[in-house]
A protein has these predicted regions:
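N-terminal Sec signal peptide and the immediately downstream disordered periplasmic leader
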Residues: 1-67, 73-77, 191, 239-240, ...
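Outer-membrane beta-barrel channels and translocator barrels
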Residues: 69, 195-197, 236-240, 322-325, ...
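Acidic, small-polar-rich N-terminal luminal/periplasmic segments of exported/outer-membrane proteins
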Residues: 32-169
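Outer-membrane beta-barrel translocator/receptor signature
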Residues: 111-113, 125, 134-143, 148-215, ...
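Residue-level signature of outer-membrane beta-barrel architecture
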Residues: 118-120, 143, 192, 233-235, ...
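Signature of Gram-negative outer-membrane beta-barrel scaffolds
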Residues: 216-217, 381, 386-506
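Transmembrane beta-strands of outer-membrane beta-barrel proteins
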Residues: 172-174, 200-202, 243-245, 327-329, ...
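Periplasmic-side early beta-strands and strand-to-turn transitions of outer-membrane beta-barrels
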Residues: 160, 168-169, 177, 188-286, ...
Length: 506
């Protein structure tokens, strides 16, 4: 199956916004250090958070440290109208919502409703929100549509994760952190000038932690293990031309517990199959009469995981100040792959269904921004945006313990695959946007914005399901048919079927 999708849209907006609607963790109150005012760039130019006319939460590096904010969930806890949905055990289904708008599915070809920007570069991965305050200058969360200020997917809002730049003075920092469940975290940062026009920053972090859960039927989950490395070079060619080059790479190997059963097993002979009647109900053979009642205990025959490897990101930002306006030229490239396995049946049964999913992705983006540099009541921003992503996502369901899947008489199937699919996508987005702001008074700012966007998606999906085999099915008396294509069996007849029949279907 091959689908090509093209879409064009134009967005026009006129708003009158009171400056007081900007909400932030940062305020002008100097009585408490964690509430000091911070400078943001959410509207493409530097401004005090109190002078910004949009609904925003801004958390600087000092607040990140003082409030012990380390994860996406921590940021959501401090941000009004923002929620974060995390898969159990740190799986691959993590999603951000703003005012009820977010990503409803992670299926290939879908896009989130909240745009995440890593140092000005668009990304679909929420993981960039978590990290050390030694490398993150601030996190800016903008609530509400931002399409006339950003290049892509900001219907619900936009999140800017702004990286720290090389400092003017030499600084070397080593931080060690220990915690429950044998948590060990190390952050090493070095930053400073090489000469009067060139600065550098390098950062490395390592985090390990045991699982919160105990497996009563096998090996315990593996917990978390992650690495991150970053290098920056910042060059001032002249007083008005700056070039920032940034590289970072991340990897992790974490547990995932997405299919853990919380209710009792259906292990009577006539129990319905969890997957319809496609394959045997694994709960029938579960060694436990009931699932664990302790929320920190699981019963599984395998240790699930999700891992990212070979992730490399390159970012280049050239800034030219002409006096009347500032021009920014952004070029980025990223490639990475991730892979995960999890217990699909949620039991410790010898009938073991395993879900295997992976993704290899390459994306590149280019953007040019024009930002007014005047001090009057009128300011403006305009930009051109280009983004291309190519991804390949395989997905399989297997039962390597089932001899009738492995020896089905049709095709070699050593992994016991009973379902497989592969999605391939090539997506290109182009956009032109602009916004003019008129500060009518200290309390009122009026904005006029225009946006044009064009999306083209070309994708294909292949699915393979084996229904027929060389060997015969059992007789209808032992294996009744169900209306529709293919043959299915009744789980109530599993025992006699295994005793006297060979199955050539899945």
């Amino acid at each position: 199956m091959k689908n090509i999708y093209q879409g064009k849209s134009v967005l026009f907006c006129l708003t009158a916004i009171a400056a007081s609607v900007g909400v932030s963790v940062a305020t002008a109150d100097n009585a408490r250090p964690m509430l000091e005012e911070i400078i943001i760039t959410s509207e493409k130019r530097e401004a005090s958070v109190q002078d910004t006319s949009i609904a925003i939460t801004a958390i600087g590096s000092e607040q990140l440290k003082d409030l012990n904010i380390f994860s996406q969930q921590d940021i959501a806890n401090f941000t009004p109208n923002m929620s974060y949905q995390e898969s159990a055990g740190g799986g691959e289904g993590n999603r951000i919502y703003m005012r009820g708008i977010g990503r409803e599915t992670s299926s290939t070809g879908t896009d989130p409703g909240v745009g995440v920007y890593n140092n000005g570069f668009y990304t679909t991965e929420s993981g960039v929100l978590s990290g050390s305050f030694d490398r993150i200058a601030r996190v800016e969360v903008l609530r509400g549509p931002q399409g006339t200020m950003y290049g892509r997917n900001t219907t619900g809002g936009a999140i800017n994760v702004v990286a720290k730049k090389p400092g003017d003075e030499m600084e070397n920092v080593v931080r060690l952190r220990k915690g429950n469940y044998d948590l060990t975290n190390a952050d090493i940062t070095s930053s400073g000038p090489i000469n009067e026009r060139v600065g550098y920053l390098v950062h490395y972090s390592k985090t390990e932690q045991d699982s919160f859960f105990t497996n009563v039927s096998g090996a315990d989950p593996k917990g978390t293990d992650s690495d991150y490395i970053e290098a920056q070079l910042d060059v001032d060619f002249t007083d008005s031309i700056n070039w920032n080059m940034r590289y970072f790479s991340a990897s992790f190997d974490n547990e995932t517990l997405e299919r853990n059963k919380l209710d009792g097993y259906r292990n009577e002979v006539g129990a319905p199959s969890k997957l319809g009647a496609l394959v045997i109900n694994p709960e029938l053979f579960s060694p436990l009469a009931t699932a664990p009642t302790d929320p920190f205990e699981i019963s599984s025959d395998m240790v699930g995981f999700v891992a990212v490897d070979d992730q490399h990101t390159y970012q280049s930002t050239l800034t030219i100040d002409t006096g009347a306006m500032q021009i920014k030229i952004l070029n980025g490239y990223q490639d990475y792959s991730w892979y995960g396995e999890k217990d699909f049946d949620g039991t410790a049964s010898p009938v073991s269904y395993v879900e295997k999913i992976g993704q290899a992705e390459t994306n590149k983006q280019h953007e040019i921004q024009f930002i007014s540099n005047t001090d009057g009541d009128i300011s403006w921003v305009a930009g051109l945006f280009y983004y291309n992503v190519e991804l390949n996502q395989p997905y399989t369901l297997t039962d390597a313990n089932n001899p009738y899947l492995i020896n089905n008489g049709t095709v070699p199937n050593p992994d016991g695959i009973f379902y497989t699919q592969r999605g391939i996508l090539d997506s290109t987005s182009k956009a032109a946007y602009g916004q003019v702001d008129w500060q009518a008074s200290d309390k009122l700012t009026m904005s006029l914005g225009l946006r044009y966007s064009e999306d083209e998606k070309e994708g294909s999906e292949t699915q393979l399901q084996v229904y027929d085999a060389v060997v015969d099915y059992c007789t209808e008396a032992a294996l009744p048919y169900v209306q529709g294509y293919g043959a299915y069996f009744d789980p109530a007849l599993v025992s006699p079927a295994f005793a006297g029949c060979r199955f050539g279907m899945v």
